[in-house]
Amino acid sequence: MAPRTAPPFRADHVGSLLRPPALLRARADHAAGTITADQLTRAEDEAIRDAVAMQEAAGLRSATDGEFRRAEWHTDFIARLGGIRYAAEWVPVPLFGSDTETTYEAHGTEVTGKVHLAEPIFADHFRFLASTVTTAVPKLTIPSPSMAHFRADLSGSGYAGRDEFRADLAAAYADEITALAALGCRYLQFDDTLFAFLNDPAWRERAAATGIDPEHQHEINVAVVNQALAGRPDGLTVTVHMCRGNYRSAWFSSGGYDFVAEAVFSSLQADGYFLEYDDERSGSFEPLRLVAQDKVVVLGLVTTKTPALESKDDL
């Protein structure tokens, strides 16, 4: 099998890495007011350099910054969009483990006006990553537009309905993609847990209780992502990563990709998919028959939920 010369690569990873102890201490010290923002940035820089060196030493063709500058993988980006801010309320999300059930408190966001790109988001993150890699392609990860509009509170936004809001959101993402490409970004990943979550009947039931159409939300998500990607610059690879969540080895949902497969795998205008397949909760490979022939699928077979390394036979 010939090696791939363009992303996504045959051996790749989704991007987020465990924060090293020194960085966790620096974050705690900054929150306590005992170090400055500049000192925290220097600690992040050092941790990112080490993470990139580790990825390149392992032979990976792409490298990320581990998302080391973020408190949360999604709201750090979403709350920097013009017209969206952090809400006062936190959002409880149920978590499941092998023998436990608990709740994760996520930052809530609210829409306060017309959504737009006030300035490129994570531009500084990408610049530093690009300056740090030596052999790998710098890969930036951002939350999918789905993550911004799924629970969006429009009550104080001035929007008459969700269609106009979604159109503005897609346009803001399109502007972000153009800005990142102008900085030299050639490998971008949308993280979209909702495509996986909506396969879970329990999640669809919770969605219905909030007034969301659980039978068609995934189709709406596909349409918004496609609008955001419609005019992306040549030479930019965009993939979509789908998983069921991982917070301290617990997860948010279960179920194969069957429910969303037809719309997502045949219609989503991304270049490839990163699909979690690390245990029986991920279902079978049967839905992959619907993947368009021009798309690349990267199977997430190596779990990050346990420290045990899978054998080649298991994989």
Where are these regions (language model features)?
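Domain-level signal for soluble alpha/beta catalytic cores
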Residues: 1-315
